[in-house]
């Protein structure tokens, strides 16, 4: 089994008949074209003929959210040698972010898009992961949970000093998926997942998760302080250390 995980930014396109924004609006993207602008609705050639979206039903959403929040709570409570977080929100699901993620996922190419912003979230971030295997009966929920844990495991290589200021450059193993996962200006996530067959027998799962905030160079990953001390809506009784699901934070740069 081969595993690859990666994190970055992504965003997407318009729902037919919905009130979502025009993703071709140049004001949404400074860094390049929006992934959802005039995006094709069909699957990409790399997906082959045997491909499908994994249904993002309530069970799979719950697995993704619970895994994210369990791991965020570990950092908020000061585990793994990291300082406690004063205001780490509970992640909740966002359908627009998930829809936008589908435009990356449907390409079946493991690569970040250049822009995935929405009207509300102008600094949207992204994590990607893919696995290819043969001869195993892995389920989508198991893969999603494993992917999220692999992102989090990058904490082993992340210097604690990065909590105060995300670096402009980093030498060594990847740490960006972990820092994206525990960013305290992120409070929503939406994901899309593809299942496709290559070379006649190789099974692939490709997961794309979009977040309300990305890593910002020179800015804190999260604000240090006594666990939950700055939560404005109290703490989450299920994921102790996180702010309640009602907590709303500004997903924007400190520098405007």
Swiss-Prot record:
Question: Which residues constitute the signal peptide according to the record?
Answer: 1-21
**The keyword Glycoprotein is annotated on this UniProt entry:** yes
Pfam families to which the protein is assigned, alphabetical: CAP
Gene3D superfamilies linked:
CAP
Q: Which family does it belong to?
A: Belongs to the CRISP family.
Indicate the segments forming the SCP domain, all copies. 65-211
- Asked if the Swiss-Prot or TrEMBL record annotates the protein with the keyword Secreted, the reply is yes
Which named protein is this? Answer: Venom allergen-1
GO CC terms: extracellular region
């Amino acid at each position: 089994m081969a595993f690859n995980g990666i994190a970055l930014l992504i965003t997407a396109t318009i729902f037919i008949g919905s009130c979502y924004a025009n993703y071709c609006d140049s004001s949404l993207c400074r860094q390049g074209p929006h992934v959802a602008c005039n995006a094709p609705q069909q699957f990409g050639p790399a997906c082959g003929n045997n491909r499908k979206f994994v249904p993002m039903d309530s069970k799979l959403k719950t697995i993704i959210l619970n895994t994210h929040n369990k791991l965020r709570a570990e950092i908020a409570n000061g585990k793994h040698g990291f300082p406690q977080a004063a205001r780490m929100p509970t992640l909740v699901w966002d359908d627009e972010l998930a829809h936008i993620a589908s435009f990356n996922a449907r390409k079946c190419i493991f690569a970040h898009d250049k822009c995935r912003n929405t009207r509300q979230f102008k600094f949207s971030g992204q994590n990607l992961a893919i696995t290819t295997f043969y001869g195993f009966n892995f389920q989508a929920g198991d893969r999603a949970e494993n992917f999220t844990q692999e992102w989090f495991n990058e904490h082993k290589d992340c210097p604690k000093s990065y909590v105060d200021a995300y670096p402009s450059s980093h030498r060594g193993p990847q740490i960006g998926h972990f820092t994206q996962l525990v960013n305290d200006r992120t409070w929503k996530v939406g994901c899309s997942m593809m299942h496709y067959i290559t070379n006649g027998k190789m099974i692939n799962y490709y997961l794309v998760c979009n977040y309300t905030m990305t890593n910002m160079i020179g800015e804190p990953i999260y604000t240090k302080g006594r666990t939950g001390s700055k939560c404005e809506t109290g703490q989450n009784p299920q994921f102790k250390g996180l702010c309640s699901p009602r907590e709303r934070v500004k997903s924007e740069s400190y520098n405007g």
